[in-house]
Amino acid sequence: MDINDFAKYPLYKSIIELNEEMERRNIPPIELNVVGGFALMIHKMRNRNDNSTDIDFVGPSLSQEIKNITNEISIRNNLVKDWLNNDLMLTGSTLEDIEFSTGRLTFNPAFELSRIKINVATLESMIKLKVIAIDTALTAVDNSGDFSRYKDFADIINLMKKTGLGYDDIGKMLDGYIINPNTLSVIKEYEKSGREGVEIKILLLQREALDNKIKIMSGEALESKTYVRSSFTEDLLNNLITKSKEKNYDSR
């Protein structure tokens, strides 16, 4: 794949400009394992001029010198400041950190410039990343947070169609990594009813999580009242027991 074929699109154009500036300043080469919307563009599963505004990659953070260059490019090409970033929703940023949450990820070479090598996540790895992102977001919802991953649903459905993978396949692929028991059912709900169906299901899950918290809190309060006595209550009970024993002794 030749990146110059896509040079008219802002993100591709910006990568070329970054490479040229790194070459001019003699900055050592970097290798980027790309995920997210940019990876889907490379896989031709999104229009190259869609609403993707950044390039997500897995790996060490960029040097400050490279960040300064990307900031300059963002102004020139009207991009967001952090258009090239490793700020993923999952814990950590290195490949090892991410794989701790997703299992093994695979990247294939996409294109290489003089100072920048781009590897792209395979379609199966993209499914893993997006399903775990939804799983993480649903866990936050259970903790009274807001759900923020609606854009991933359509991508997952399209990736499943492209790869031929079903829900059982994904369940096996991510066995031991999916935390929330509702993750796959929520994705199924999107495929069936769209965003509206997911919003309703999430509201029901939030209500269920709240009910469970109330039950737990009520149980803790009951347990506290049942087993943890105040010093006053303890003294009162001891006095009553003592008096009862004295009464029984006197009645003999």
Where do the PLM segments sit?
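Compositionally biased terminal segments of proteins
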Residues: M1-R252
